[in-house]
Amino acid sequence: MDRTEQKSIIEGLLFVSGDEGIYPEQIAKVLEIEGNEVIDILEEMQKECEGAHRGLQIVQYAKVYRFATKKEHASYYQKLIEIPTAASLSQAALETLAIVAYRQPITRTEMEEIRGVKTDKALQTLVSHLLIKEMGRAEGPGRPILYGTTKEFLDTFGLKTLDDLPPLSEENEQMNEADLFFGSLQEISK
């Protein structure tokens, strides 16, 4: 395998490793080459990214390498964040999000028991909007996935912690879980 192909594969590995990044030792195992050769290639790639007119750079934090955007383009990334998304959240997604927020960690089956209908599509939408994520697995038959809210959920609603959620009275808990967020969620998702 030549150097160009090694760089191409490393570039892909950096991409798929995401924010977690990747250790040179992991790259070495994948490419079946020595660790010091991986470091040399990564350093070459860093210089290539710095010198070129590219939007990404390769950064190293605590022995982990990952892609990052260049700081000089930050104002453009901020503009993108401020553009409203075309896809809005459905009422089913809003109801499901409220249930997750108040009952997390919670399984899909538990959500469906509360809502009385399937939640598959709503869950997919909420995960794709980064408002909820898998938090682990429940004990019991089938070890179902547990869902909970994300940091993006807190940021979207201006909450520091889940303790900042409005309290629910016991008698209205199931009826009003979704209603608490409808107004603000519909505004955000427009």
UniProtKB/Swiss-Prot annotation:
The keyword Translocase does not apply. It holds the Pfam family SMC_ScpB. It is found in: Cytoplasm. GO terms for biological process: cell division; chromosome separation; DNA replication. Gene3D superfamilies: Winged helix-like DNA-binding domain superfamily/Winged helix DNA-binding domain (1.10.10.10). GO terms for cellular component: cytoplasm. Participates in chromosomal partition during cell division. May act via the formation of a condensin-like complex containing Smc and ScpA that pull DNA away from mid-cell into both cell halves. Belongs to the ScpB family. This is Segregation and condensation protein B. The lineage of its organism: Bacteria, Bacillati, Bacillota, Bacilli, Bacillales. The gene is scpB.
